[in-house]
A protein has these predicted regions:
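Inter-motif core of Ras-like GTPase G domains
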Residues: 98-123, 132-137
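Conserved catalytic network of the ASCE P-loop NTPase/AAA+ motor domain
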Residues: 18, 74, 83-85, 106-111, ...
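Active-site-adjacent beta->alpha loops and helix N-cap segments on the catalytic face
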Residues: 126-128
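Canonical P-loop GTPase G-domain recognition
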Residues: 149-205
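Conserved G1/Walker A P-loop phosphate-binding module
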Residues: 2-67, 71, 81-91
């Protein structure tokens, strides 16, 4: 799987005057899992990217096992925007994946209502830190498995849930970060999850 998106969203889409609700969503996961690609594929505006070319200085510091062909890395965050309907807008922040930039995550989580954890099953261990930090911040999240063509294992969702020790209430779905409709389905799943959590709190309070 490359990072080229197969469906291009409309660019320079104006924000609807009727938009009432803006939600900050963070996309997290390991290096090379597809965070920048996801933000790029679903954003209705030209996304802000802070990608830089990887240099020799990162050799021995950055873990590139399984993504050796990747030549750029996000050094701050990606930003995009998508309107799910006339009244709800999601502001997307893609977190940097390299371990040396993880200190930025806690700042990105400030004011976040929900998150997407992208998982690459070739590098499953890279997902642990993201899940741990979100649980620490008590930030609701969904897990999206970005399938790669060269993954020899092709684990089932149930196997992935067990490997990550995900509770049953945490949504777990497949996705293709390159495809706009697939990425949008992930975000809709997250919004529905947030709504269900809010309804549960309301009925139990």
């Amino acid at each position: 799987m490359g990072s080229v998106t197969s469906e291009l969203p409309f660019r320079r889409t104006p924000l609807a005057d009727a938009a009432e609700t803006g939600l900050k969503i963070v996309v997290v996961g390991g290096f090379g899992v597809g965070k920048t690609t996801l933000v790029r594929s679903v954003s209705e505006i030209r996304p802000l990217n802070t990608e830089e070319v990887m240099t020799q200085a990162g050799v021995g510091v950055d873990e590139t096992h399984g993504v050796a062909a990747k030549t750029t890395t996000t050094v701050a965050f990606d930003f995009g925007r998508i309107s799910l309907n006339e009244h709800m807008v999601l502001y997307l922040f893609g977190a940097p994946g390299q371990e040396r930039f993880w200190f930025l995550w806690d700042r990105l989580f400030s004011g976040t209502l929900g998150a997407v954890v992208l998982v690459d099953t070739r590098r499953m261990d890279d997902s642990w830190y993201a899940i741990d930090r979100l649980e620490h911040h008590k930030t609701p999240f969904v897990v999206a498995v970005n399938r790669f063509d060269d993954d020899p294992c092709q684990y089932s969702l149930e196997e992935i849930r067990q490997a990550l020790a995900l509770p049953e209430h945490v949504p777990l779905i497949d996705c293709d970060a390159r495809v706009r409709t697939s990425g949008k389905d992930v975000l809709i799943t997250l919004v529905n999850h947030l709504y269900e959590l809010a309804m549960t709190r309301e009925t139990t309070s």
